[in-house]
Amino acid sequence: MKMLSIEEELKNNSYPGRGIVIGKTQDGTKAVTAYFIMGRSENSRNRVFVEEGEGIRTQAFDPAKLEDPSLIIYAPVRVLGNKTIVTNGDQTDTIYEGMDKQMTFEQSLRSREFEPDGPNYTPRISGVMHIENGTYNYAMSILKSNNGNPESCCRYTFAYENPVAGEGHFIHTYMCDGNPLPSFEGEPKLIGIPNDMDEFTETLWHSLNEDNKVSLFVRYILSLIHI
């Protein structure tokens, strides 16, 4: 798979929607994740990320302008022991609760589908990072409608064992702007991951469309043994 520039991917797409990046730094010592949200409506744009425990949740920037909280207020990031869960919806809780009961990432998501926001039927994208005794692996998932048909749910899981230093994967909800919004297609995109968190954060934030970007979260976890 050809490695893509995350900067170019974002600059050339005015509305990828919500996106998850997971990977490993070039020096092989840190696990990396990033999550961003975008919005076109006032309700979607009226959000910020706030810390909650070891993770984050979305919160209305102006509570007076909050219209429908059902699909926009949730915890995108939660930590369960040596696992970090990152998603674009309340399936974060579904995965957390399932894995806490010894279910797998994939099994935990069996009870969920795409979001009920027809005609877009926004995909649910999710990721989990597992770090233990200096080893690291991660998985990503997308649950989406079958070409806009809400009667059929397509489920895809991508697992990455012993990921390569300096590489990561990027998945987002929409291929591009549109009406209805077209769901993401294909495998998560292979991208480069730098060593410096501030550099990566700046690259992501400044590459996102100025009119549509809302919030960005980036985390580097220093717990990998580089051999």
Residue ranges and their predicted role:
Residues 2-33:
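Intrinsically disordered, low-complexity terminal regulatory regions
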Residues 20-27, 126-132, 218-221:
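Short hydrophobic alpha-helical segments used for membrane anchoring or interfacial signaling
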Residues 29-79:
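Glycine/small-residue-rich interface belts in oligomeric ring/scaffold proteins
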Residues 31-34, 84-93, 128, 137-143, ...:
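Short hydrophobic-aromatic micro-motifs
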Residues 225-227:
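Conserved small/polar residues in nucleotide/adenosyl-binding loops
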